[in-house]
Structure formats: structure tokens, C-alpha cells
């Protein structure tokens, strides 16, 4: 049984997308308000809650109680925990369960969980009956600051991360920071990588604030809500300007070109969480930027130092069993990166750094340069 939630005044961040705009509501102890918020948005709608086994143990009962208290009929769909559910088999299961539950276009799907559940439930909502609205109730730090915002949904392919999906914006995001108390330390750290990302890509002052306040964010003080809100504001602003990732939104993929390849190489397993891959990927992107003469070595050292202080991996050798087949091979990693969603006309696209808080999108890095860079990084790692 989870500890009782203690309320705080919520912060609301608007994702401005015209008639598809929606609110991100952030606060401690706000999960019980979910039912009344949904009832106000969709009177009479039924709700199918999609969650995973771990989250169901902690938060499904409270979520159902909130919905039922607002007079909302509910059903539940529980999937396996982890990336294993973000698959063709996983999306088939959720879609069939939604159809069996007779969820109609005027009903709602509620994604109660971390990034995997949000991506999976959102994709199912996008394609069942050619589109059902959905609400994100993110329960991991990573989901609260990143994956629940912006409408990217989808599943993995054996060929790579997030290669099958759709843009489908939620109608509401309710981020209760109290639920983060049930995360394991490793899960929390993995989510923190995405928080640090916002400072690196466009806000040096925020990165400096994180360096000072990281310990308080971990403790769950008001600094945690501030970090979540600042991250959501940063992402919401970019999404409002570039919803479909035709330009600026690509900056949000800082660290992801390398990181997704590493996740694929490790079989989407517990060897490497998504945020851990992003952490290593951001350091690699910074180091590649330095090699290209774009960023000062002192900035790279500062990035590496803060991520390491936060308990995140920063080197390839930090990955468990990194010498296994498919990881410790530069050509293999290059092949995986060639499947990245940002590839255009066969050329890799990287998010590189000119300084902390100054990121740029580049398709000008020669593949041979990247391959040699990776080969050196792999050779640096002890056997």
C-alpha cells in the first residue's frame, strides 16, 4: 500500500496547439482530482485504464476510485512491465482489449504508467476506431518530463526504437509528483537524464540550477515540482512551434541517436534503461561536438561530471555486459543508427552542442567520422 498523498497547489502548463491545446497539471497529491478533471472534459465518457503490473500494484486502486467517485465507468487493461510490452504483440493485445471493452470514439483511454505505458496506450488510442482521445497520467520521472508531453506514441521494432507509431496528442496530462516516491532509485535516475537534457539543449541557467538543486529534486521537495514544471514548459514551447518534428523539435532528441542504438543493441532489456542510454548518448554527442571543434572541453567535462554525480552512466563501459555481440562493434552501432527516425536521404542526423544550453541539428557529420569516433570510444573501454 502506497503512502497517503499530500496535496500541493498544482501548476498548469499549456501546450498551445490551437483547438487541440491541452493542459499539463503538475503537483503533489493531485491524483485524486483525476476523475473530476476528466468528467469536466468529457461528460459521460467511459474510461479504459491501461497500466502495467508494477504501477497497478501502487496506483490503480486510487485511480479507479477517483474515476468512480466522479461517476465514470471504468475498465482496466494490465500489461507486463517494461519494454517487452512495447511491441507488436503488446499493441495487438491492448487494441483487442479496448475493442472487447467496447471503447468508442467518444470514450477515453487513460495511460497510467511510465514511458512504455504512455507510448503503448497512446498508440492504441490513435488507431482503435481510427482515433480515441486519451489522457496521460505519467508515473515515472521520465514520463512526467518528456514522453507524456507532445503526442509521440508508438512501439519498438526488432530493427530499432520507436519505429512504428503515430502523433496523437493527449487531451490532458496529470503529473502527480508524489507517485515518483514509489520509483526505484535507478528508475528515478534514468528519468533525471531527460531533465538534464532541457538544460543542455537550450537553457544553461536551468542546467546550473540542476547542479545546485539535484539533491533536493531526489528528496522530493518543492524543487522536484519545479524541475518537472520547467521541463514541461521547455518541451511544450518547442512542441507548440514544431509539433511534427520538421525542425526545432528534433533538438529534443539530444543524446537519442546514440542512445536508441545502444538500447537496441542491448535488446531493450534491463541492461540499459532509456534514460541511461540518453545519458551516455548526451555525453557521446558532447564529446563528438568537441572533436568537431564546436564545444569547449571544459563544458564536456561539466556535463559528464553532473550526470555522473546524479548516478547516471556516462561511458560505454558503464553498460552491463557491453562486450556482448552487437554492442562492442562500431559498424554494428552505425547500422543501428542508420534506422534512426531522423535519418534523411540516408544521412544520419545528430543533435550537437556548441555550448551548454546551445544545441544544433546537424546532418553534416561524415559517417566515417562517427564510425572512427565510436571505434575509439569502444577501444577506450576496458575488457
Swiss-Prot record:
Gene Ontology cellular-component terms for this entry are:
cytoplasm
What gene is behind this protein?
A: aroB
Concerning PANTHER family, the annotation shows: 3-DEHYDROQUINATE SYNTHASE, 3-DEHYDROQUINATE SYNTHASE, CHLOROPLASTIC
Stated family: Belongs to the sugar phosphate cyclases superfamily. Dehydroquinate synthase family.
Q: Where does Zn(2+) bind?
A: 194, 256, 274
Any one of the GO BP annotations: aromatic amino acid family biosynthetic process
The protein in question is named 3-dehydroquinate synthase
Q: Which InterPro entries match?
A: Dehydroquinate_synthase, DHQ_synth_AroB, DHQ_synth_fam, DHQS/DOIS_N, DHQS_C
Which residues are involved in binding NAD(+)?
81-86, 115-119, 139-140, 152, 161
Q: What does this protein do?
A: Catalyzes the conversion of 3-deoxy-D-arabino-heptulosonate 7-phosphate (DAHP) to dehydroquinate (DHQ).
**What keywords were assigned to this record?**
Amino-acid biosynthesis, Aromatic amino acid biosynthesis, Cobalt, Cytoplasm, Lyase, Metal-binding, NAD, Nucleotide-binding, Zinc
> Broadest EC class?
lyase
EC number(s) on file: 4.2.3.4
Cofactor(s) recorded in Swiss-Prot or TrEMBL: Co(2+); Zn(2+); NAD(+)
Q: Which reaction does it catalyse?
A: 7-phospho-2-dehydro-3-deoxy-D-arabino-heptonate = 3-dehydroquinate + phosphate
Q: Does the keyword Ribonucleoprotein apply?
A: no
Q: Which Pfam families match?
A: DHQ_synthase, DHQS_C
Identify the NCBIfam families for this entry.
aroB
Entry keyword Transmembrane helix: no
Amino acid at each position: 500500500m502506497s503512502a497517503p498523498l499530500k496535496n500541493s497547489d498544482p501548476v498548469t502548463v499549456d501546450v498551445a496547439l490551437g483547438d487541440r491545446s491541452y493542459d499539463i497539471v503538475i503537483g503533489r497529491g493531485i491524483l485524486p482530482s483525476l476523475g473530476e478533471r476528466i468528467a469536466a472534459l468529457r461528460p459521460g465518457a467511459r474510461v479504459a485504464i491501461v497500466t502495467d503490473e508494477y504501477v497497478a500494484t501502487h496506483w490503480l486502486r486510487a485511480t479507479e476510485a477517483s474515476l468512480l467517485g466522479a461517476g465514470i465507468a471504468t475498465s482496466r487493461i494490465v500489461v507486463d512491465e517494461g519494454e517487452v510490452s512495447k511491441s507488436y504483440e503488446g499493441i495487438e493485445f491492448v487494441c483487442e482489449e479496448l475493442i472487447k471493452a467496447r471503447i468508442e470514439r467518444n470514450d477515453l483511454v487513460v495511460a497510467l504508467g511510465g514511458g512504455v505505458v504512455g507510448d503503448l496506450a497512446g498508440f492504441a488510442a490513435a488507431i482503435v476506431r481510427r482515433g480515441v482521445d486519451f489522457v496521460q497520467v505519467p508515473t515515472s520521472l521520465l514520463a512526467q518530463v518528456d514522453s507524456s508531453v507532445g503526442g509521440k506514441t508508438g512501439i519498438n521494432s526488432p530493427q530499432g526504437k520507436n519505429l512504428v507509431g503515430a502523433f496523437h496528442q493527449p487531451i490532458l496530462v496529470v503529473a502527480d509528483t508524489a507517485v515518483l516516491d514509489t520509483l526505484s532509485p535507478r528508475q528515478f535516475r534514468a528519468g533525471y537524464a531527460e531533465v538534464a537534457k532541457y538544460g543542455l539543449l537550450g537553457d544553461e541557467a536551468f542546467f546550473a540550477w540542476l547542479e545546485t538543486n539535484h539533491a533536493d529534486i531526489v528528496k522530493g521537495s518543492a524543487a522536484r515540482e519545479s524541475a518537472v514544471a520547467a521541463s514541461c514548459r521547455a518541451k511544450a514551447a518547442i512542441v507548440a512551434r514544431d509539433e511534427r518534428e520538421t525542425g526545432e523539435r528534433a533538438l529534443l532528441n539530444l543524446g537519442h541517436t546514440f542512445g536508441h542504438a545502444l538500447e537496441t543493441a542491448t535488446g531493450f532489456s534491463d541492461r540499459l534503461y532509456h534514460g541511461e542510454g540518453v545519458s551516455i548518448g548526451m555525453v557521446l554527442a558532447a564529446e563528438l561536438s568537441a572533436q568537431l571543434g564546436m564545444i569547449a572541453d571544459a563544458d564536456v567535462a561539466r556535463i559528464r561530471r553532473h550526470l555522473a554525480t546524479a548516478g547516471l552512466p556516462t561511458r560505454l563501459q558503464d553498460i552491463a555486459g557491453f562486450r556482448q555481440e552487437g554492442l562492442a562493434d562500431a559498424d554494428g552501432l552505425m547500422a543501428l543508427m542508420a534506422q534512426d527516425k531522423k535519418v534523411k536521404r540516408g544521412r544520419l542526423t545528430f543533435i550537437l552542442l556548441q555550448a551548454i544550453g546551445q544545441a544544433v541539428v546537424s546532418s553534416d557529420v561524415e559517417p566515417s567520422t562517427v564510425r572512427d569516433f565510436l571505434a575509439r570510444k569502444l577501444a577506450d573501454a576496458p575488457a
